Amino acid sequence: MPIPLLAEGFGRGLSGIPYAWPVIKTVPWIALVVLLKWYFSGATCRAERVMHGKVVLVTGGTAGIGSAVVRELATRGAQIVLLTRHAPNDPFLVDYIQDLRSQTNNELIYAEQVDLASLHSIRLFATKWVDNAPPRRLDMIILCGSVMTPYWGTPTTTDEGLEEEWMVNYLANFHLLSILSPAIRAQPPDRDVRVLFSTCSSYIGAQLDLANTDQKTKSGSVSYARSKLALMTFAYAFQKHLDAYKRPDKMDNNARALIVDPGYSRTPGTRRWLSGGSLVGLFFYLFTWPIWWLLLKSADQGAQSYLLAAMDAAYGQGAGGKLIKECRELEPLREEVQNEDIAKTLWQFSEKQIEQLEKDAAIKRAQAKKEQEAKKENEEATKRQKKEEAPTKNAAADAKPKAAASPKTDAASSATEQKKQTPGSRRSKKAK
């Protein structure tokens, strides 16, 4: 078939080939779309690593890029511990883990309830993990959990009074790693321990304003960018914190902090941001979906830089504190993230903020507990009072029928006495 068509084309020209000109006009556009799709799909991770026996903690591992990372690591045999706000018996979480186990042929996938919007929830989990004796194995922590307010939405606040994006995207990670730090440093010197932070290019235009973290900002994008800038600053400071630790065995530090920028991807968070969190915006997103399909990565494509940071042997040795994007190392575009003075100020501010918030939350929990106990005591007192009043009411109820029946009894007794007295009186009359 192709040979006769080519022969016809050489003999009679393109006019002799059916649909030749439409095909010639269409092919360049198809090639352009394919080229753009290839370009925006990003780099692919070529690294491989045996993950059998590795214990990996993951936040944000039930959706988006985090879900793709979890699936790839579980396929390679890693033991996954998902940190999620859902209870372990939540139907969604149960089905998700069962599906993941069957897809990856890996039964070592578990979940722990950790609400990143609650400092108390984070402390409960982290202290339980650290208090284990001997220290539990920990090979990797992947921090994918984050929230993003739609571009025309207003950021919300948590129950503890913090802006949600500041709390979930930054302070939760700071709090979690601050408590887990002893467990990270207690790992054997031959163990390759990695901590993966998640960032976004929005940090480039952010301002690290620490004065208004407990207030709603006017723009969700501003709040999100600020939280990512703070997280990057903390990541570099955390690496220095690990390096400064002197191991009892005199060995070098074996834990490395790596910062990963996955690029713009079609995740649930991105979809919510583009749609504005509204039904009209969702219709707009669906209408323009071909554009987002072309320009944005899929979740699997966005996970490639995470997989490189998790599996490439080069990141298991040498210095940490590296930024990875498109599967290659880059230098941060903001000098502040590596500034020691700014990092120290941020660290101290975060510690004081957490201390104050936990004190306030503890007072609220104590008050709520007292109110609950008082309510319970009142309910028990009411029940006891009802039980005590019940016999009295029953006795009164029994006394009323007896009182009502007493006149009839008296009348009957008097009639009986009269009957008894009648024969005697008759005999006395006859004697007279």
Regions found by a protein language model. Give the residues of each.
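Alpha-helical membrane-targeting segments
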Residues: 13-43, 151, 204-207, 217-221, ...
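Rossmann-fold NAD(P)H-dependent dehydrogenase/reductase core
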Residues: 38-274, 357-370, 375, 379-386, ...
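Non-membrane alpha-helical structural segments and their capping/turn regions in soluble enzymes
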Residues: 119, 167-174, 296, 300, ...
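Alpha-helical packing segments of well-folded alpha/beta enzyme cores
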Residues: 125, 234, 302-306, 346, ...
